[in-house]
Design a protein with these regions (language model features):
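Active-site neighborhood of HAD-like aspartate-dependent phosphohydrolases
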Residues: 2-59
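Residue-level signal for pocket-adjacent positions within structured domains
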Residues: 15-16, 67, 137, 149
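Conserved active-site and cofactor/substrate-binding residues in soluble primary-metabolism enzymes
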Residues: 24, 75, 163
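Membrane-proximal basic amphipathic "stem/tether" segments
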Residues: 44-49, 56-63, 238-251
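Short, compositionally biased "basic patch" segments
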Residues: 50-77, 137, 141-142
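Metal-dependent phosphoesterase signature
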Residues: 64-98
Length: 251
């Protein structure tokens, strides 16, 4: 991959889940909503039924994202917007990795363009982007209706893997297709983001698993291991399960 010098200002590209905070933000926001309206746990009845369909690849990740979001069924748009605002100032704020937020602030001070690029539904990404001072944000485009339906619509692809790179090019946020971006840092915890890390001159892995760590070793990517409120990846998965049921309490 050729090194581009077209944009000397550079970029700082950040994944969200398990990168800026130690949780899946979809599950953490679900946890917050269920603690406000406990009756919404009824969504678990059909979500659990859908899991075998996902295992059999009858439902893809895009569809499962819609099924999971069914905990919002019947919610008014203004209520959802209020919950997002409250969530960002409470549970989300408590969960942030201070060390990674400091990296965001460093890149801002050094003049790089900050891009939050996540597979999460975009209805809360605008607030996260504003809160943390990003210049741009990209997520999975989930439609917010005046009253939320059982299966919210997703416009476009699930913003994951190479789709993140395509989205940045389509929005003209980056240039030089096929080129490595000079003076640029990319941050992620996931091997799904190897494409994102690979286009940056500097890659930073957050608690990488084996596959990502092996790839990072080839490229000389840096590793960060901020303190997590659980032990290992299985601890993180268990936290997501508890959050999906609305019973997780942040310390």
């Amino acid at each position: 991959m050729r090194l581009s010098s077209v944009m000397p200002r550079g970029y700082a590209l950040f994944d969200l889940d398990h990168t800026i905070l130690p949780f899946d933000t979809q599950a953490l926001f679900c946890n917050y909503v269920l603690q406000q309206e406990g009756w919404r746990r009824i969504y678990l009845a059909w979500f659990l039924v859908s899991l075998p369909l996902a295992a059999l690849k009858i439902f893809n990740l895009r569809m499962m994202k819609r099924v999971f979001a069914s905990y919002l069924v019947g919610m008014k748009k203004e209520t959802l917007e209020r919950y997002v605002k409250e969530f960002l100032e409470s549970d989300f704020d408590k969960a942030l990795y201070p060390e990674v937020v400091a990296e965001v602030e460093r890149h801002r001070e050094e003049g790089r363009t900050l891009i939050l690029n996540s597979a999460s539904p975009d209805f809360y990404l605008a607030g996260i982007s504003k809160k943390l001072g990003f210049d741009h944000h990209i997520g999975t485009e989930m439609t917010v209706e005046d009253t939320m339906p059982m299966l919210p619509r997703i416009l476009g692809p699930n913003n994951k893997c190479e789709a993140k790179i395509v989205a940045m090019h389509e929005r003209a946020l980056i240039s030089g297709e096929g080129e490595m971006l000079a003076n640029t840092w990319a941050y992620s915890d996931s091997s799904a983001d190897i494409p994102l890390l690979s286009i940056a001159e500097n890659g930073v892995m957050i608690h990488p698993g084996n596959r990502l760590a092996e790839e990072g070793l080839k490229h000389g990517w840096r590793t960060m291991t901020p303190k997590r409120p659980y032990n290992g990846r299985w601890g993180g998965r268990w936290a997501s399960v508890i959050q999906a049921m609305g019973f997780y309490r942040l310390k």
